[in-house]
């Protein structure tokens, strides 16, 4: 290998040095990107964990709102039935 380096021209030596520097910079950049992606992954996992903690609370609120909707529908149904009975009582002959 040393014989090959001695036989290289000045331009080739410069190219090899620059290539080594660029490869080193690329390696450092890739390491930094990997570290930042690991940090992002940890943050996302923590966010998902917090969201899962609220899952039970959201189910309780969902049951509450569904119960309110069904209660409103029952009230409307009872209200319509009561108004029909009142109409029948006021007008028993159906006129």
Curated annotation (Swiss-Prot):
It comes from the Eukaryota. Pfam families: DASH_Dad1. Its main location: nucleus. One of its GO terms (cellular component) is cytoplasm. Coiled coil: none annotated. One of its GO terms (biological process) is mitotic sister chromatid biorientation. Keywords: Cell cycle, Cell division, Centromere, Chromosome, Chromosome partition, Cytoplasm, Cytoskeleton, Kinetochore, Microtubule, Mitosis, Nucleus. It is found in: Nucleus; Cytoplasm, Cytoskeleton, Spindle; Chromosome, Centromere, Kinetochore. One of its GO terms (molecular function) is microtubule plus-end binding. Belongs to the DASH complex DAD1 family. Component of the DASH complex consisting of ASK1, DAD1, DAD2, DAD3, DAD4, DAM1, DUO1, HSK3, SPC19 and SPC34, with a stoichiometry of one copy of each subunit per complex. Multiple DASH complexes oligomerize to form a ring that encircles spindle microtubules and organizes the rod-like NDC80 complexes of the outer kinetochore. DASH complex oligomerization strengthens microtubule attachments. On cytoplasmic microtubules, DASH complexes appear to form patches instead of rings. Component of the DASH complex that connects microtubules with kinetochores and couples microtubule depolymerisation to chromosome movement; it is involved in retrieving kinetochores to the spindle poles before their re-orientation on the spindle in early mitosis and allows microtubule depolymerization to pull chromosomes apart and resist detachment during anaphase. This is DASH complex subunit DAD1. It comes from Kluyveromyces lactis (strain ATCC 8585 / CBS 2359 / DSM 70799 / NBRC 1267 / NRRL Y-1140 / WM37) (Yeast). The gene is DAD1.
